[in-house]
């Protein structure tokens, strides 16, 4: 089993437990160059809010700082944006789905920024 399969196995177990809770899910996906966050409905079929480093406003803001989307500063910015968008959609509380990634570095920065911006999980 390679590391990608291991990550997906961990993600599957987390998603099963979150589905039992019947709450909105904040899912995070990261690549070497970008980070993505989406808030899914409790049934898991509809995306209620999303933010990523591919958005034009985010890219413009990151160009002023470091010019890249694959760092902790970018993850912090995405965490704030996803919290604002979720609150605008009427979502106050979510379950955090780290998609099998370790809670460290960019994933941790995104989660902490979302919490500071008022999202509860």
Swiss-Prot record:
The Gene Ontology CC terms held by the record are: cytosolic large ribosomal subunit
Which keywords does this chain's UniProt record carry?
Answer: Ribonucleoprotein, Ribosomal protein, RNA-binding, rRNA-binding
Q: Which one of the record's GO molecular function terms can you name?
A: 5S rRNA binding
Q: Which CDD domains match?
A: Ribosomal_L18_L5e
Q: Which GO terms describe its biological process?
A: translation
Subunit text: Part of the 50S ribosomal subunit; part of the 5S rRNA/L5/L18/L25 subcomplex. Contacts the 5S and 23S rRNAs.
What NCBIfam families does the annotation carry?
L18_bact
Q: What does this protein do?
A: This is one of the proteins that bind and probably mediate the attachment of the 5S RNA into the large ribosomal subunit, where it forms part of the central protuberance.
- Family statement drawn from the similarity comment of this UniProt entry: Belongs to the universal ribosomal protein uL18 family.
Q: What is this protein called?
A: Large ribosomal subunit protein uL18
Please tell me the species this chain comes from: Burkholderia cenocepacia (strain HI2424)
- Mind giving the lineage of the organism this protein is from? Bacteria, Pseudomonadati, Pseudomonadota, Betaproteobacteria, Burkholderiales
């Amino acid at each position: 089993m390679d590391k990608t399969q291991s990550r997906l196995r961990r993600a599957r177990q987390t998603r099963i437990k979150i589905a039992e809770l019947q709450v909105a899910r904040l899912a995070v996906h990261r690549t070497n160059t970008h980070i993505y966050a989406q808030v899914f409905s409790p049934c898991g079929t509809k995306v209620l809010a999303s933010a990523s480093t591919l958005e034009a406003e985010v890219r413009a803001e990151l160009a002023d700082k470091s010019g890249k989307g694959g760092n902790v500063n970018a993850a912090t910015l995405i965490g704030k944006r996803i919290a604002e968008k979720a609150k605008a959609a009427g979502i106050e509380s979510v379950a955090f789905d780290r998609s099998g990634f370790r809670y460290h570095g960019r994933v941790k920065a995104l989660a902490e920024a979302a919490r500071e911006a008022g999202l509860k999980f």
